[in-house]
């Protein structure tokens, strides 16, 4: 599906490159970032879903949604868009797409309340969390040509 309202693949790839470059600078020990805020998900995928997106430093991103997978497949050029029910599934679903989580990941901590953050960490044993809020803020601060049109 192609529409002027849809986020072009080139724009998404540009955003990924910018986020990855910032991750390497601001959080060089992480293997990628897990974004849970709806605004962050939209920025990285072009669809406004309830779930999360895993953007590894190397490899393909994975969008996991609680619902609305069919709509996301129409709106987003991502190859890996899957449903999920529990945070316990995140590790295996990402690995199944060829983009496994690393032992250290960046998470948009502003997108979580205290209890949700604790639940996510308890479901992902052995994974160390750091913040990617500065990465997202800096990436979104500089507008691309497409965003300025």
Summary of predicted features, one role per range:
Residues 31, 79, 103:
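Conserved acidic residues
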Residues 1-60:
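Terminal domain-start leader segments
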Residues 35-36, 64-66, 83-86, 130-134:
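Conserved beta-strand termini and adjacent loop/short-helix elements that scaffold enzyme active sites
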Residues 65-92:
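Compact, glycine/acidic-enriched structural inserts
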Residues 57, 76-79, 123-125:
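Short, structured coil segments at secondary-structure junctions
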Residues 54-67, 107:
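Short internal beta-strands
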Residues 2-3, 11, 16, 89-149:
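Flexible, acidic/His-enriched mid-domain "rim/lid" segments that flank
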Residues 38-39, 65-71, 111-116:
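Short, polar loop motifs at secondary-structure junctions
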């Amino acid at each position: 599906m192609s529409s002027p309202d849809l986020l072009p693949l080139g724009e998404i790839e540009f955003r990924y490159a910018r986020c990855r470059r910032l991750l390497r600078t601001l959080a060089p020990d992480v293997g990628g970032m897990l974004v849970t805020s709806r605004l962050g998900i939209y920025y990285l995928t072009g669809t406004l879903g309830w779930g999360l997106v895993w953007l590894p430093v190397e490899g393909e991103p994975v969008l996991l949604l609680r619902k609305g997978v069919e709509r996301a497949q129409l709106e987003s050029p991502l190859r890996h868009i899957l449903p999920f029910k529990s945070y316990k599934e995140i590790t295996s679903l990402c690995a199944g797409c060829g983009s496994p989580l690393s032992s250290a990941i960046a998470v948009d901590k502003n997108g979580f309340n205290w209890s949700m953050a604790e639940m996510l960490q308890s479901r992902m044993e052995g994974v160390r969390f750091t913040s990617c809020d500065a990465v997202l803020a800096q990436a979104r601060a500089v507008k691309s040509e497409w965003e300025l049109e």
